């Protein structure tokens, strides 16, 4: 990713984002797959589902890229041709990046006193079951998907007297028609 800013004085700042990823899906036993994805970057937070910023801009217009990383590890087990169970664990971490404008005033991401929406990390284990009721190579498939997940979120800053993180349990059910 390329980023540019222009200052009132007609100067410009430039930054080039970089990143890397390692991913694998391995069938370690018949019908049992292990999945691994990872992503480390500077300036690529939007590629982590928009959960981290790409950059911060200081008062003089200079650009500073935000470093972030994410990963997912999990398994899928096809019990029968019509039944699949799965479990994944995923996480996102975004490093703070800010500059001090004046005493008690900062600009950027994750500074003391920033919004509690500036997440330091988000973690989520997921477990689910997929039941395929009907499947045809010509017409598609009809599936019922259930999923449970537990989400934990920790911002860089929280006001005094509030919890350091937030967490929730989520349950999903989905009737899905899969196109051929």
Give the label of every model feature segment:
Residues 1-125:
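Detector for outer-membrane/organellar transmembrane beta-barrel domains
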Residues 36, 75, 127-129, 146, ...:
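Hydrophobic, well-ordered secondary-structure elements that form the walls
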Residues 123-133, 142:
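Conserved C-terminal beta-signal and adjacent last beta-strands/turns
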Residues 96-99, 130-134:
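Short regulatory "switch" loops immediately downstream of catalytic or recognition motifs
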Residues 137-160:
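C-terminal beta-signal and adjacent terminal beta-strands/loops
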Residues 129, 165-180:
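Outer-membrane beta-barrel "beta-signal"
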């Amino acid at each position: 990713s390329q980023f540019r800013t222009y200052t009132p004085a007609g100067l410009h700042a430039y930054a080039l984002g970089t990143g890397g990823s390692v991913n694998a899906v391995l069938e370690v036993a018949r019908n049992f797959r292990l999945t691994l994805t990872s992503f480390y970057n500077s300036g690529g937070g939007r590629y982590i589902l928009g959960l981290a910023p790409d950059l911060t801009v200081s008062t003089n217009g200079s650009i500073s890229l935000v470093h972030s990383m994410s990963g997912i590890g999990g398994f899928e087990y096809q019990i029968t041709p019509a039944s699949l169970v799965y479990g994944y664990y995923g996480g996102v971490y975004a490093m703070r990046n800010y500059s001090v404008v004046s005493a008690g005033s900062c600009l950027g991401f994750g500074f003391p006193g920033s919004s509690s929406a500036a997440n330091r990390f988000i973690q989520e284990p997921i477990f689910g079951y997929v039941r395929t009721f009907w499947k045809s190579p010509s017409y598609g498939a009809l599936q019922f998907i259930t999923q449970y997940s537990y989400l934990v979120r920790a911002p860089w800053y929280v006001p005094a007297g509030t919890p350091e993180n937030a967490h929730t349990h989520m349950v999903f059910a989905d009737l899905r028609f899969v196109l051929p």
